[in-house]
UniProtKB/Swiss-Prot annotation:
PANTHER family reported in the protein's UniProt record: PEPTIDE DEFORMYLASE (PTHR10458:SF22)
Domain of life, source organism: Bacteria
Designated gene of the protein: def
Residues forming the catalytic site: E171
UniProt KW keywords: Hydrolase, Iron, Metal-binding, Protein biosynthesis
Descriptive protein name: Peptide deformylase
The protein's required cofactors: Fe(2+)
UniProt KW NADP keyword: no
Function, as annotated: Removes the formyl group from the N-terminal Met of newly synthesized proteins. Requires at least a dipeptide for an efficient rate of reaction. N-terminal L-methionine is a prerequisite for activity but the enzyme has broad specificity at other positions.
Length: 198
């Protein structure tokens, strides 16, 4: 049933990626429910063995050209992630470190401690051939975000750490018209001073 969704990712240099998104009304209408289901279908399928999509762990509505404050994060409980990220408290039976569509997300707290992924970040909206993608992307190690949970059908606050916090901040940037390449400092591309590297 979910395969009816047509997925077209907006990529640089499209200007919509540089625009700020706007909050949506709660309760969700049919259009926003369909948007959430499209995001779930797209990213979940992208993590499968026979996917036609570029693999991803998150997507923001603006990446479909839709300026709405909503993103989906689906981070599998992958031993390659958890072994290098000791901040995650993961039970072996948990399939995901995090999985939900969040509407109207707002950061209400962030840690002073900073973190980055050792090989840098990537993005579905930034083609792999786009220049100046190499370098550490500095993020807050922990953040608290409030918003509306699609799966729980209520307002919630999430306290996320490590890799999941990085993914959250990557998607939150999209909602503010920013991309990960904006956060790479060309003067210290791989400088690890003052940050934890995963």
């Amino acid at each position: 049933m979910l395969t009816m969704f047509k997925v077209e990712i907006v990529q640089l240099p499209k200007k919509v990626l540089r625009q700020k998104s706007k909050n949506v009304n709660i309760p969700l209408n049919k259009t926003n429910i369909e948007l959430a289901e499209k995001m779930i279908y797209h990213i979940d399928d992208s993590q499968g063995p026979n996917t036609k999509f570029r693999p991803g762990v998150g997507v923001a509505a603006v990446q479909y050209g839709i300026l709405k404050n909503v993103f989906y994060v689906c981070v599998p409980n992958d031993s390659r992630l958890t072994q290098r990220d000791s901040s995650q408290e993961v039970k072996p039976e948990d399939k995901y470190l995090f999985r939900d569509v969040i509407f109207n997300p707002e950061v209400i707290w962030k840690s002073d401690e900073m973190v980055a992924i050792s090989q840098g970040e990537g993005c579905l909206s930034v083609d792999e051939s786009w220049p100046n993608q190499e370098g550490l992307v500095r993020r807050h190690m922990e953040i608290k975000v409030k918003g509306y949970s699609y799966f729980q059908k209520k307002e919630m606050i999430w306290h996320v750490k490590g890799y999941v916090a990085i993914v959250f901040q990557h998607e939150l940037d999209h909602l503010n018209g920013m991309l990960f390449i904006d956060r790479i400092d060309p003067k210290r591309l791989w400088d690890k001073s003052g940050i934890k590297v995963l």
